[in-house]
Amino acid sequence: MRYFLTVSFCFVICSTAFSQDKSYKIGFLLDKTNSKIASLVDKLEEEITAVVGEDATVVFPDNNRYTNNFDPLLAKNQYETLVNEVDIIIAYGVVTNEVLAKRDTYPKPTILFGTVNEDFIEDGKHINHEVDNFTSIVTPLSYREDLEFLKNLVGCKQVGILIERGAIAYDPISEMITSLAAELELDLSLVPFDNTSDIINALDDQKAVYFIGGLYLTDSEMKTVADALIQRKIPSFTTSPISDVENGLLATNNDQTQIDQFFRRIALSVESIVVDDVFHESSSLLTVNKSLTINFNTAQKIGIPLKYSLIATTNFVGDASDIVADKEYDLVSVMTEVIAENLTLKEAKQNVYIAEKDAELAKSNYLPDVSAAASANYNDPEFAEATNGQNPEVLTAGNITLSQTIFSESANANIGIQTALQKAQMEDYNREELNVIFESATAYFNTLILKANYKIQSKNLNLTKRNLEIASQNFEAGQSGKSDVLRFRSELVQNMQDNIESFNQLKQGYYVLNQLLNNPIDLIIDVNDAQLDSGIFEEYDYHEFNGLLNDPVERKPFTDFLIEEALNNSPELKFLDYNLIATERSEKLFGPGRFLPTVALQGQYNHVFSRSGAGSTFPVFIPTPPDGYYNVGVSLSMPIFNQNKQNINKQIATIQKEQIQFSTDNVKLQIEKNINDAVLEIINQVTNIELSIVFEETAKEVLELTQTSYENGAVNIIQLLDAQNNYLQAQLASSNATYNYLIAMLTLERYIGNFFLLESTDERNAFLARFLEFKANIED
């Protein structure tokens, strides 16, 4: 037995040593490189290492990455060098492809990968034929299809085709450009470049651009080019991967899965070399799923309208809710602007002005009433002669009359009533102002919620597209039935509808804000995100506020203090108080006040301007009166019995007084209830913030595990759909938690009658000082 164990142990040791002795050096031959290409090569190395696993040791010497800079002679020499330095050669690029494809023999296993235009695919030497130590893995690319996509997307008539200068001689586009232009009815021109400056300098002559090249531009260089295109509002399309669209180009017909499929296919080819030691593999076309990818933000910036029909077949990058706005708002700017511009408030302000004028009108009863009059009379001559000068044939005269109230209880009462009603109207305006501010703040947060909802629905749509791909792959591999594919297609349709609705709801949210802010409804606005510990909320210490509410010992006195503050600040109570003052004054008027007399002063000055004709002179026995004379008098009046109206009016005033008192008590109870409700809602939202984070993290992890299990056939579609929907709900809950908390805080502030964001630091400190004083008084 000991002998058997010894032999077995030796066998294991030898086998392990033999496995570890298998080592392969892998080198790369490229047309050009930069940080982006180097990163992709690093990723390919990781994929190869993972696939080969323990079958052998693969080594990637840094000095065996060669670039020829589009020089075919250099590419040929570099290949010969790699033959002597490494065991496996991986090559990429149009020049490299041209050089290696012309060879008859390959001393070392050589893997060539890249793209080939569909119009030039033929059954040639390296397609579907075995060549010792050589395979080419190419994916078809259609310039015609890309240009047609670009034309349909933006409606262009002229397109500049951007390509590296060194690659022109080796790319079929030079041969195809004439036929493509005729077939697609486009004005096409080649725009060669060596660097970003060449591209930018050529943009002024372009209406749209198509990148055949550009893979060798770094991310920062591509962003520079994309910014220049956006500035000139030039749409762009590219053959390069999705990362360039993420950097600002408009669209591509590729997505990230193409690179992943390439790398996996190359890694499998390397594995076959390692395992078999002999490399016999047919060159082949790698068919990948094409998917139109559009940068939503770029489309919006250059003014390209996107059709809803694109949602089903298109992947969107960027943030559709991140728009180029004519105006941007944070919460404070919304609150301050709505005070100044809201039409409801402007209308309510007019009522205040009217009440002010009513008060002025009441006070004007004590101002003198002065009037002037003039007359011209013609009398019958015979009648005039008979009146002895009292009514001459022709008479012109005038008078000035003065009337001045000295004392009037009804006038005094009216002044008091109108003054109280003016103040009541002002409190009604304050109530309306608080309501409109709260409405605008709620609309602001609702817009943020709708924005977050749209982002999440977009992510969920992309997730469903990915799950549909997995279901299709499982169906093709025989791991699941077609029903899974059909189910995800149905889910995709529903998600598309949800996505469209969420986007339109976001636009409606902007419409609501525009209406409240008195902006044109179609004005493009955006709202800045709101976070508790940053921006305008940084100095707005909600954590201390939460601490008072979260502590059961502190909560009761703090809630009582908030109720007291609300009662002191409430414009509803002040409105009722002023109405009560007006009603009491009315009650007094129709009570004892009715026995007070009204005293007034009257005076008049008369003047005869002319007397002529018959009867214009007085007889000698009648003294001639002066042409001008005056009279002054004082009047006193007091109602004795006015059809019992005084008693009835007093009774009405008494009833109204009791009614106002009932309303006041009801409002006080309502305020107390509202404060307590708001405090509980804040506590709910505080816990919701913490729990929603855990909910989202857990749901995400469950989805990832379920997705992997479904991909491997370990779970069914129902479990995957449940996990996806659960994650969707978790995301919605998590993203909205902070906004709902802030809405709850603003609701409490509305009930208190004071918005802290509109206060100064001193005013907020004074609020805290009042609470400490209130608490101290309770403890005493």
Where are these regions (language model features)?
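Periplasmic alpha-helical coiled-coil/stalk elements that build and connect Gram-negative outer-membrane
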Residues: 435-565, 681, 685, 726-727
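Bacterial Sec-dependent N-terminal signal peptides
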Residues: 1-23
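A small-residue-enriched
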Residues: 270, 338-406, 519, 563-642, ...
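Acidic, low-complexity, intrinsically disordered peripheral segments
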Residues: 511-529, 733-780
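A short glycine-centered flexible hinge/capping loop motif at secondary-structure junctions
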Residues: 303, 475-479, 710-714, 751
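Extended amphipathic coiled-coil alpha-helical segments
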Residues: 347-365, 413-459, 466-473, 490-499, ...
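Short hydrophobic alpha-helices and adjacent helix-cap/hinge residues
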Residues: 20-325
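Bacterial Sec-pathway N-terminal export signals of envelope proteins
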Residues: 317-367, 521, 533-581, 586, ...
